[in-house]
C-alpha cells in the first residue's frame, strides 16, 4: 500500500479540514505530519461547526486510527482544550488517537518568546499567530527541544533546563511577561496528554501499510508558507509540501501515492508578506464577506484576491499533485467577471514563473472570464454546472495540467461534487 497526501497549494486556509472529512471514508488511517495549533481546520456538518488545531480531521469518522506525527509541534494546554471539547460533543478520542513520541512540545516560554521576537522586529514582523511555533521548531533544529516522549522520563529536569534557557533569552530582550497562568494550564495539559497512546509513528505507519491499511496524510497551512519554497521570510517554520509527509511521519518517498492539492477558486492570505493578486477595493471586501474569511484560530481578517495561477503552477510542480480539489466556488457565484493571474510583471518584464525574491512590487497580469452568476450551493452533480463555470474549470485545468476532481460549492460536507467519476 501507499500513503496518499492531502495538502494546501496556496497560503493556507484552503479548506483542508472539510476535504479530509469527505475523503476519510476511503481510508483506514489519517495522519498529521507537520505544523501546530497555529492553523485551524474547519469542518461543518449536520448543523455543527468544528475547528481542529492539532487533532487530525479523521476523528469524526467511526473507528479510524488518527496519528499525530513526529513533524507536528504540540501545545499540551491547547490540545487538552481541543480534545475535551470534542469528547464533550460525542467524539471519543483516547482509543483512536495516537501521538508520536518524537513530536516536539510547545512550552509556555515558547509562546512568550514568539511574542517577544515579534515585538523586537517592529515593522519587519512576520505576523505570527503567537502560538510559539517558530521558537519550538528553532529548539528542534538546535537539538534542544523537549519531545512528547520526554514527558515519561526525567521530564521535570528537561523542562526546567529548557525554561531556564528561554528565560535568559527573554531577560536579554528586556521583555516583561507573566508565566504563572500559562504554565499552570500547560502542566495540566501534560498530565492529560499522558492518557493517550504514545507511539513510534514511523513504525506504526509503515506496519499499517504492510498490513494493507490505507493512509491519508493531512498537511496544515499551505505550500506558499513552506519554510523553503514559500514567500520567505513570511512563511511558517515547517515543510508544508508533500516531502514533509516523508520527514513528518517517517515514510519513504516511494510510498507516496496520490497527492491531492487543494486550492480556493480565489486566493487569501493571513498575516504579512507578498500577495500579488490582493484586492484593496469593494471586490476584495465582497470576497471576504461572502467567504467568511476570518482566521479559524486567530479570528484575523484574511486578505483576499483573485486566483494566482503563477503561484499555483509552482505549487503543483513542487508537490507532484495528481488530483486537484477546488474549494469555495460558491463565493464567486455573484461576480460578473472572474479574473485569474497568469503572469507577473516585474520591473516592466513579464514572467510566468514564481521568482526567488517575490516582493510587494510584483504586478499581476490577468486573464478575464465571464462569471456564472448562478447560485451553485444546492447543486448535486456537475451536470448542473453553468456553462461559464465549466469554462472556468477547463481554463484552470489547461493552465495547471491536472484534473480538478472535486469541487466544493458550500461549507457543509454534503456540498461537495466529484467529477470524472466514470474513470
Which residue ranges define each predicted feature?
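Non-transmembrane, aqueous-exposed alpha-helical and coiled segments at domain scale
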Residues: 1-423
Amino acid at each position: 500500500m501507499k500513503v496518499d497526501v492531502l495538502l494546501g497549494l496556496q497560503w493556507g486556509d484552503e479548506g483542508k479540514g472539510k476535504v479530509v472529512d469527505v475523503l476519510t471514508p476511503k481510508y483506514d488511517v489519517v495522519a498529521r505530519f507537520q505544523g501546530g495549533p497555529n492553523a485551524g481546520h474547519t469542518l461543518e456538518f449536520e448543523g455543527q461547526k468544528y475547528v481542529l488545531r492539532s487533532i487530525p480531521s479523521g476523528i469524526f469518522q467511526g473507528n479510524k486510527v488518527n496519528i499525530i506525527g513526529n513533524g507536528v509541534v504540540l501545545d499540551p494546554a491547547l490540545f487538552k482544550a481541543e480534545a475535551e471539547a470534542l469528547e464533550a460533543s460525542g467524539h471519543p478520542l483516547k482509543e483512536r488517537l495516537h501521538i508520536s513520541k518524537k513530536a516536539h512540545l510547545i512550552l509556555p516560554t515558547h509562546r512568550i518568546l514568539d511574542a517577544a521576537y515579534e515585538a523586537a522586529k517592529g515593522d519587519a514582523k512576520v505576523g505570527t499567530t503567537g502560538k510559539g511555533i517558530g521558537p519550538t521548531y528553532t529548539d528542534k533544529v538546535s537539538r534542544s527541544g523537549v519531545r512528547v516522549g520526554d514527558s515519561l522520563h526525567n521530564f521535570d529536569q528537561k523542562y526546567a533546563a529548557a525554561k531556564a534557557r528561554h528565560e535568559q533569552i527573554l531577560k536579554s530582550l528586556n521583555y516583561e511577561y507573566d508565566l504563572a497562568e500559562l504554565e499552570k494550564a500547560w502542566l495540566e495539559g501534560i498530565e492529560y496528554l499522558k492518557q493517550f497512546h504514545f507511539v513510534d509513528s514511523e513504525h506504526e505507519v509503515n506496519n499499517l501499510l504492510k498490513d494493507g491499511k490505507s493512509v491519508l496524510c493531512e498537511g496544515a497551512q499551505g505550500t506558499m508558507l513552506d519554510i523553503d519554497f514559500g514567500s520567505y521570510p513570511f512563511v511558517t517554520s515547517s515543510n508544508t509540501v508533500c516531502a514533509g509527509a516523508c520527514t513528518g511521519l517517517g515514510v519513504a518517498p516511494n510510498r507516496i501515492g496520490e497527492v491531492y492539492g487543494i486550492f480556493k477558486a480565489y486566493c487569501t492570505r493571513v498575516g504579512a508578506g507578498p500577495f500579488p493578486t490582493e484586492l484593496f477595493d469593494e471586490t476584495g471586501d465582497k470576497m471576504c464577506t461572502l467567504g467568511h474569511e476570518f482566521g479559524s484560530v486567530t479570528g484575523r481578517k484574511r486578505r483576499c484576491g483573485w486566483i494566482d495561477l503563477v503561484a499555483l503552477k509552482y505549487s503543483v510542480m513542487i508537490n507532484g499533485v495528481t488530483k486537484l480539489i477546488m474549494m469555495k466556488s460558491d463565493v464567486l457565484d455573484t461576480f460578473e467577471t472572474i479574473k485569474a493571474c497568469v503572469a507577473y510583471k516585474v520591473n516592466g518584464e513579464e514572467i510566468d514563473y514564481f521568482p526567488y525574491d517575490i516582493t510587494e512590487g510584483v504586478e499581476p497580469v490577468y486573464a478575464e472570464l465571464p462569471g456564472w452568476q448562478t447560485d451553485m450551493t444546492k447543486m448535486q452533480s456537475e451536470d448542473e454546472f453553468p456553462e461559464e463555470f465549466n469554462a472556468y474549470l477547463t481554463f484552470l485545468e489547461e493552465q495547471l495540467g491536472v484534473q480538478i476532481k472535486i469541487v466544493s460549492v458550500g461549507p457543509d460536507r454534503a456540498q461537495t461534487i466529484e467529477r470524472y467519476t466514470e474513470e
